[in-house]
């Protein structure tokens, strides 16, 4: 039996991805503790897992990348936030290690400070990544803008140029992170590209064909999407709803995407669909809701997906992959963060359509959703591939292997 310590960043969409694997580890006889957002602790404890909040000073540093004017500007803003959090994550994880005495540490890939502390601990440790893998590779577009893959020379020059620019742009973040690493006796990073490969193991919550085919880094184990969500009662109105459902989602972390819900409500008002929107960071009372629609802050998506004709997604990895894992096509309207990359993958894998928020209009959104509905076959192919990726059990086995390697006796 081993003790596993899981550490998440404060983003709402990053708290639940490791939960299914934590349950798998527990069911194999291991002790599991999760340090996560204060809002998630109760839901995790109800599962019989040990949980505690991360340092509140970390949660008090919000992502403000939604204010950026470009995708690269948003990435830079996010890195600045990660660096500010790192000052608190390092001692926070060190205290957790002292309290829990783990045999294994599993860290959110967006918690760069916690990862630094995990590496310096000398214990077996791993990353988890709940978004598209950002590392450059041949045939894979430079991460950020959501460009389509292409093997042509112009695209290779474009991608190489942007990758070189990002190395310069993110140099201050790498420099600051290296100061933390030096204080802990760790070697310096050469660039931001070192972060995804520095852990002995990275559990990637995705899989081909949603992900672009590529030569994967040796530390990556792609296990398919993280589908766990808190149990919720099936909405009482769902059983009586006979119309095909269009599910609309907004980001759980504020990014000013309420216009997507407003546009969807207008696009399908009076149409033969039931529109169900989860507003998350937005107040449901702020929307004018037509007779064939409802807006609630949160609803369990799983039972609704079982009845959905399509999902209108903001391009968040969690909602998008839950839809595709259910074989439901997606119309992705990305705003920022990894959403541009997620939305392009929806289009490229044949699981739905992509509509730029700059072109967002009721008639265009309706046309894009109707086109997405015709992509159910592609969504089902992605669903089948996800089911064969191994899921939480594969992730648990990979994590167990780290501890097994550490415990092997040294040959004399």
Question: In which residue ranges do the predicted regions lie?
Answer:
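Nucleotide-activated sugar donor-binding and catalytic core shared by glycosyltransferases
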Residues: 1-10, 16-33, 39-50, 96-99, ...
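Short internal beta-strands
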Residues: 32-37, 275-279
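Conserved nucleotide-sugar phosphate-binding/catalytic loop shared by glycosyltransferases and other
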Residues: 34-78
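Short gly/pro/ser/thr-enriched loop/turn and capping motifs at secondary-structure boundaries
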Residues: 41-42, 58-61, 132-138, 339-340
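Short, charged, surface-exposed secondary-structure boundary motifs
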Residues: 61-67, 135-142, 231-233, 305-307, ...
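A glycine/proline-hinged amphipathic helix-loop "lid/cap" segment
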Residues: 64-65, 75-87, 138-191
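Donor-nucleotide binding loops and adjacent catalytic segments primarily
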Residues: 206-310
